[in-house]
Regions:
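Charge-dense, helix-prone N-terminal extensions
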Residues: 1-114
């Protein structure tokens, strides 16, 4: 999965928008003004930070060494996924969906997309 495909997939989520609030190297994808994904645009291999259920994140770290505690984030509620080819794209998309859904669920109804 490359940067362009990943960015396109993230922005296809209802209400998703992109921003660079930290620096020009870190793309932040938000829904309802809240972050659900962060990408280092020059990372090699590509890395993505995603919101996660704390228990599920721990379970994913065992079979997938590429799933790590969230870099520069709350390590309990965020994970960093190194996109080095060791995790199937379907699993990565599932992690993205979970991150998006967790953030949307936490939004006030007035800020939830459609």
């Amino acid at each position: 999965m490359n940067f362009a495909t990943l960015r396109s997939d993230l922005l296809s989520k209802p209400g998703a928008s992109e921003d660079f609030p930290f620096d020009v190297q870190t793309l932040v994808i938000k829904v309802g003004g809240k972050m659900f994904a962060l990408l280092g645009i020059n990372d090699d291999p590509l890395r993505i930070n995603l919101k996660c259920d704390p228990l599920k994140a721990e379970l994913l770290r065992e079979p997938y060494p590429a799933v790590q505690p969230g870099y520069h984030m709350n390590k309990r509620h965020w994970k960093t996924v190194v996109l080095d080819g060791s995790i199937a794209e379907a699993e990565i998309r599932s992690m993205i969906d979970e991150s998006y859904e967790l953030v949307v669920k936490g939004l006030p109804k007035s800020r939830r997309p459609g």
